[in-house]
Amino acid sequence: MNKVFKIGLIGCGHIAETYFRAEKYFNNIKIIKCADINEKASKRCALNYGIKSTTVNEILKDKQIEIILNLTIPKAHYQISKKALINGKHVYSEKPLAINLNDGKKLLKISKKKKLYLGNAPDTFLGGGIQKSKELVEKNIIGNVKLGNAVFAFPGIQSYHPNPEPWFTKKEGGPVIDMGPYYITALVNLLGPAKKVTGTIIQGQKYRTIGIGPKKGKKFKVECPTTYLSTITFKNNSVIRLTLSFDVIAHQRNHIELYGEKGSMIVPDPNMFGGSVLTCNKLGDNWKEFKTTKMPLGRINIRTQSSRANETPTNANYRGVGLSEMAYSIENKRKHLCSGEISLHVLDIITSIMKAASSGKIQYINTLCVKPKKFSKLDIKKLLK
């Protein structure tokens, strides 16, 4: 029987709903208190989920809380996580780890000094889709991966989010900070650490119009680049072309394609947990499908659309498994999978892409991480209710 960790939630925005739902799937996490700088949001969250609303300072000082779940906006991630660590709490944060590399390094240093766990989303790479892809890559089904493409492109969230402005601000906005962590974390999981990046930016519309909610019809200024084109070279010499854009109305590209010496692979959406993996090993052959619907974290559990959790119908969403796996790792004194080291390396790649794009110069990645081990079925079953 796993220990149930008492969790304090800071940041009661839309994504919080997903972590409360995670309690239905995983047996070792329980959110008992919540806090937000917006007291109304905190009280509403507490009422909805039958927990206690409190202040940020009170939740950080609460001795019964063992893990702080940091769901604040990106620019607040560093300060909240730092305060939590200083107060002796383990931390699991939404992505990114911080909005600049130095702050990320500081968090990792504090966590190591105080012997605390620092975890970070995304945890989607633990799902059936990416784990099956990892299994096939490591079984050498397509041979050594030489190159590939990764694409996230859509017109932006302003049409369906009532408060889209933070996604377009100067320091924390743009597609690299928002969606980059999903794609880059998946690629690091499949190919290992990166060594250098290049980048180019495209500036889309100067103003966007909010399409829903009380501010519907209001225009706001775009302060950041809205398309990044990057090339990531990994330490194993694989080269991946990455496109991240808020300027594309529609496209028919696959999320990730890997091209090896013996074949090609289509990797499912790294922003979700399920999806089929496809491989082809001979020109003109049909693609072979590897379904993940019978895998523990690939089973379909979503039937309705929910932009709040980036969900699509007939898909799998088990967000929160990274938090659960970290809690299990704390109890069993082992290394967790959504680790601070991996998150810092991903942050290094993200900030380096932005620097490369603005400067026109190659940026070298200075952080290191170990490619995550496979998330075994046995370990998954230990966490599931």
Model-predicted regions and their roles:
Residues 116, 143-147, 166, 355-385:
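C-terminal capping/lid region of NAD(P)-dependent oxidoreductase domains
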Residues 66-67, 73-74, 78-125, 140:
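Beta-strand-loop-alpha-helix segment that lines the small-molecule cofactor/substrate pocket
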